[in-house]
């Protein structure tokens, strides 16, 4: 990094912070974690991408910047204005940390945006290793309890790590059901997988690993079941702390009702949709699987993963389990202890 390139300005409008010191401390930690300099300012000092916190409902004058990551602490509609590359919304003050990470990965480990539909959220970020290929492909499906405030930036770190290990990474964004409906979400992840056939890279489509985190674990394993007879299908499917039993998830009100909010109804009112969508109900999948859990995660998710592993084994699926220390995000963190075991298992299957 050069002195200029490792600097990030966070341009904040007056009055957006309830306590400026708290925000400054959070920003300092986030910058330090990535080896960056910068801080909260009134105006940007360079020409690189900046983080802008305009305040609720305010417009960003994008003509002032080459590229912007916008942050709104509360929930709001997405800002699709020109030059706004990403909009972090609804994540509270911690949105600043996510924004700094987004700038870091975009600046130092850029990918190529590939669209698979007409809607702005129908896109993936492709990263390709050095060399000629063809490369095995890791398809990444982010979680966030199917809510629109969570986007594919959650998978940036693991995408960069896997690319460095020799995998092309296909980091999928999709329309979430809280804003677009359950069928739209299901259709988007299927379309994103199928779009690998026309991806602008040398890819080995016989070596696809489909990796989903949290709610993305449900989407990934449901997609695996749906793709068995399709032209593009995974050779290995990973659940990373996945919500693999939607009936149990609904009964236990996981994520403050995240399952029924996503599907649009409780299990008793929409049993057919739940059973079509729940990986537990789709067994056997007929594709090798790896079920990954961090033992410090929500005990409901840990229990669901263990129950799913037992059921998949009983259904004669080829399935393995990896458990290790950490919380919910350890399974997508390349610096975590469990990550070493995850990539070793994937390498053994595909490399």
Predicted segments with their positions:
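C-terminal catalytic histidine-bearing segment of alpha/beta-hydrolase fold enzymes
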Residues: 2-10, 44-46, 50-53, 292, ...
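N-terminal cap/lid segment of alpha/beta-hydrolase-fold proteins
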Residues: 4, 15, 19-38, 73-132
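Short, surface-exposed "cap/lid" segments of acyl-processing enzymes
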Residues: 12-19, 130-161
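Short alpha-helix in the alpha/beta-hydrolase fold that links the catalytic acid
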Residues: 23-25, 301-311
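Catalytic nucleophile-loop/oxyanion-hole region of alpha/beta-hydrolase
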Residues: 150-159, 170-207
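Gly/Ala-rich beta-loop-alpha elbow adjacent to hydrolase catalytic centers
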Residues: 212-216, 220
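Hydrolase active-site cap/lid region
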Residues: 222-270
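The feature captures the conserved acid-bearing segment of alpha/beta-hydrolase catalytic domains
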Residues: 248-251, 266-302
């Amino acid at each position: 990094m050069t002195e200029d390139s490792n600097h990030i300005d966070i341009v904040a409008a007056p009055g957006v912070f309830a306590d400026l010191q708290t925000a400054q401390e959070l920003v300092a930690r986030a910058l330090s974690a990535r080896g960056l300099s910068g801080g909260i300012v009134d105006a940007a000092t360079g020409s690189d991408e900046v983080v802008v916190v305009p305040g609720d409902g305010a417009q960003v004058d994008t003509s002032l910047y080459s590229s912007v990551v916008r942050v709104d602490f509360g929930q709001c509609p997405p800002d699709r204005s020109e030059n706004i590359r990403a909009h972090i919304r609804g994540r509270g003050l911690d949105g600043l940390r996510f924004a700094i990470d987004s700038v870091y990965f975009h600046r130092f480990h850029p990918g190529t945006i590939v669209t698979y539909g007409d809607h702005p959220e129908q896109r993936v970020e492709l990263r390709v290793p050095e060399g000629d290929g063809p490369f095995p492909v890791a398809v990444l499906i982010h979680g966030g309890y199917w809510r629109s405030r969570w986007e594919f930036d959650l998978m940036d770190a693991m995408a960069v790590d896997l690319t460095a290990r020799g995998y092309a990474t296909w980091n999928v964004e999709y329309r979430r059901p809280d804003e677009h409906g359950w069928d739209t979400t299901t259709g988007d992840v299927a379309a994103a997988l199928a779009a690998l056939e026309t991806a602008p890279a040398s890819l080995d489509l016989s070596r696809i690993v489909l990796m989903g985190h949290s709610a993305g674990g449900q989407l990934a394993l449901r997609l695996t079941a749906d793709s068995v007879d399709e032209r593009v299908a995974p050779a290995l499917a990973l659940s990373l702390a996945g919500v693999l039993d939607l009936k149990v998830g609904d009964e236990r009100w996981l994520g403050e009702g995240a399952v029924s909010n996503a599907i649009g109804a409780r299990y008793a009112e929409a049993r057919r949709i739940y059973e079509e969508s729940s990986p537990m109900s789709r067994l056997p999948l007929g594709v090798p699987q790896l079920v990954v859990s961090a033992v410090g995660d929500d005990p409901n998710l840990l229990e669901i993963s263990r129950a799913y592993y037992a059921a998949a084994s009983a259904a004669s699926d080829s399935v393995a389990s990896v458990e290790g220390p950490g919380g919910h995000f350890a399974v997508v963190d390349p610096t975590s202890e469990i990550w070493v075991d995850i990539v070793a298992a994937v390498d053994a299957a595909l490399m």
